[in-house]
Amino acid sequence: MRQPIEKSLRQRALEYLSKREYSAVELAQKL
């Protein structure tokens, strides 16, 4: 079976963006 590469890439991008947003919120709270 072949895994849908597009789906995994999209999921990885979403996780990366969510992590960036979380870190940004954390930094904003620290300031």
From Swiss-Prot:
From the Swiss-Prot or TrEMBL record, state where the protein is found.
Answer: Cytoplasm
Xref: InterPro entries: WH-like_DNA-bd_sf (IPR036388)
Q: What UniProt keywords apply to this chain's record, in alphabetical order?
A: Cytoplasm
- This chain is encoded by the gene named recX
Determine the domain of life of the protein's source: Bacteria
A Gene Ontology term for the protein's cellular component: cytoplasm
State its role: Modulates RecA activity.
Q: Could you list the residue ranges that cross the membrane?
A: none
The record's family statement is:
Belongs to the RecX family.
Name recorded for this polypeptide = Regulatory protein RecX
